[in-house]
Every structure is written in C-alpha cells, then in structure tokens.
Amino acid sequence: MKIYSAVFIGGALGACLRYGLNLWIHTGQFPAATWLENAAGSLLLGILTGFFMIGAKRPLLSAFLGTGFCGGFTTMSTFSKETVMLLQGQPSLALLYVAASLISGIIFALIGVFVGRRIAGIQQRKGLQEK
C-alpha cells in the first residue's frame, strides 16, 4: 500500500508542477512548456534510472519520483494533441516539434543515466572509504 501512496502523491505533485509551468510559460505557436516538461522529465527519469542501476535499491523512492512524479510531470497526451493542432495549419512546425521532442528526450535520458550512475558510483566509493 505504501508504494501506491508514493505513486499517487508523486503523480499529484508532478501534475501540479506541470500545470504551473504551463501557466507560467506562454510562448507563441511552439508548445515550449510541454517540450520543457518532457525534456526535464526525461532527464530526471534518466538520472533515477542510472542511480538505481548502481546505487542502493529504494523501491519507495523510485515509485515516488519515477512512476509518480515523472509520470505526472511529463505528458504524452498533451504532446499528441499539440502535434495534431500544429498539423492543421503548420505541418513544418509540427514536424520540428516531434523531432525536437523525440531527439531531446532520448539525449536527456542518456545524459541522465550517465549522471545518475556517476552519483551512485561516488556514493559507493564514499561508503567504502568510510569503512
């Protein structure tokens, strides 16, 4: 039951932050807020993945931050809706949006995994030195 609560609370916090960013970031025709949310979420999820690959396994924290927060913060449905809206009048901008979203998401996830693994490795070395 704790895992479900962690996912629920993390998801609520992530969704609230996403909503706040959408209110704060108003751009022209390019949906910058959704792009930023998905790129930042990919980076954070990459960091968590890399960290938990090497570091201590923390299922509650992983559920809260990964499934919950990142799941609530990022949004595939809004990305899809915005792409369809752009396709109606600006197909070239829609193509740019899709390409930028996919490429940056993958790149940020890779960077995140690298950073997370480095953090976990540093923590492991500190733990060994203290013993």
Swiss-Prot record:
Single GO MF descriptor: fluoride transmembrane transporter activity
Residues annotated as binding Na(+): G71, T74
Gene Ontology BP term (one): cellular detoxification of fluoride
Entry keyword annotation includes Nucleotide-binding: no
Record localization: Cell membrane
Membrane topology listed for this record: Multi-pass membrane protein
Transmembrane parts of this sequence: 5-25, 35-55, 59-79, 95-115
Cellular component GO terms held in the UniProt record: plasma membrane
Annotated InterPro entries: FluC
This protein's UniProt keywords: Cell membrane, Ion channel, Ion transport, Membrane, Metal-binding, Sodium, Transmembrane, Transmembrane helix, Transport
The reaction(s) this protein catalyses: fluoride(in) = fluoride(out)
Activity modulation: Na(+) is not transported, but it plays an essential structural role and its presence is essential for fluoride channel function.
Pfam families, sorted: CRCB
Major localization class: membrane
Reported function: Fluoride-specific ion channel. Important for reducing fluoride concentration in the cell, thus reducing its toxicity.
Family: Belongs to the fluoride channel Fluc/FEX (TC 1.A.43) family.
UniProt name for this protein: Fluoride-specific ion channel FluC 2
Organism the protein comes from: Bacillus subtilis (strain 168)
Gene: fluC2
